Structure formats: structure tokens, C-alpha cells
Amino acid sequence: MTASTKDILATAIRSIPDYPKPGIIFRDITTLLGDAAAFRLAVDELVKPYEGLGVDKIAGMEARGFILGGAMAHQLSAGFVPIRKKGKLPYRTVSMAYALEYGTDEMEIHVDAVKPGEKVILCDDLIATGGTAVGAVKLLRQIGAEVVSACFVIDLPDLGGRKALEALGVEVRTLAEFSGH
């Protein structure tokens, strides 16, 4: 990815200071999603490394991972798997607790969302501490997925999420980095 592509994507992301609490800068991709050219560029760049690899499924984390993951799945002719908050899926599920900044939460996936050995890419808008993404990787592996990679539009490298995923042996790809929180 070229420096100009990174600049275009970073510029399309709105930064909101002191949200959701003082000292946090919220990186809002809704501006990127609303800009047709930037959205197309982001999806094209997310997909590019995986073309021709025979990826079976894209797993998207609620909620912005659904938007990006659905677009990726379409372009890669792959299926899409939603990873949802507990209690939101209608069929039998497998769940996994994961760490939040203050406490824990649970995510779920349908028991039959992935066949054993299927190649899956995890997708979301942002990787920060990695708690949600690590939980999602463990959940996917629990039902037999081969997690090929995880991709995100934004990396907040100071928070260590990329390193947490890499410690699990998961390749991580991102499009833009922002320092701080």
C-alpha cells in the first residue's frame, strides 16, 4: 500500500476527542464509510492480500466488522460469519468470554458457522487492546476454523492488540495507524 493510499484512508477517518470519556480519541470510520471512494479503497486494500488464497469465510465482529467483512466476503466470493454479542443469534451457539478495559463480555457464533479446517479471515474496523479480537480468534478456533489472518482498517499500536494476536500466531494486517488511545 502506498503512502498516498494510507494518507487518503487516514484523512477519511474522523477523530473525536474525549469520547467516550476524557483522554480518549475515538477513531470514527463512519466518515470513511460515507465516502464512496474511500470506502471502496479501504475494502480493495483489505481484500488485496487475500486474493487467490482460497479463503472460505470472512468473520466480522459486531458491528462495523459486519460492514467491512460483508464487503470483503463479496469481493472474495467467500461466506460471511457474524460474531455477535451474547443472546443475538437465533440458532445454537458457542460462546467465549473476552476482556474489556473494565471487566468482561461474551461473544457468540453459530455452532455450524464454520466447517473444520475452513480458512477464515477475521475483520473489524479497529484493533486496540485486542481483547475482542483475541476472543474471536479463540472462538473461531474452538469450532474448527483455520484463522488465516486478521485485518483492520485502524491499528492503535500503543495499546498492544496487534502483538496479542501475533502471540496467537495470527497474521495481522491494518490500513492506518494512530498513536495514543
From Swiss-Prot:
Keyword match Metal-binding: no
UniProt keywords, alphabetically: Cytoplasm, Glycosyltransferase, Purine salvage, Transferase
Top EC class for this record: transferase
Domain of life: Bacteria
Pathway recorded for this protein: Purine metabolism; AMP biosynthesis via salvage pathway; AMP from adenine: step 1/1
GO MF, one example: AMP binding
Keyword Glycosyltransferase assigned: yes
InterPro entries: Ade_phspho_trans, PRibTrfase_dom, PRTase-like, UPRTase/APRTase
GO biological process: one example: AMP salvage
Gene3D superfamilies reported in the protein's UniProt record: 3.40.50.2020
Function: Catalyzes a salvage reaction resulting in the formation of AMP, that is energically less costly than de novo synthesis.
HAMAP family: Aden_phosphoribosyltr
Protein name according to UniProt: Adenine phosphoribosyltransferase
Organism (species): Neorhizobium galegae
Lineage: Bacteria, Pseudomonadati, Pseudomonadota, Alphaproteobacteria, Hyphomicrobiales
The gene coding this protein: apt
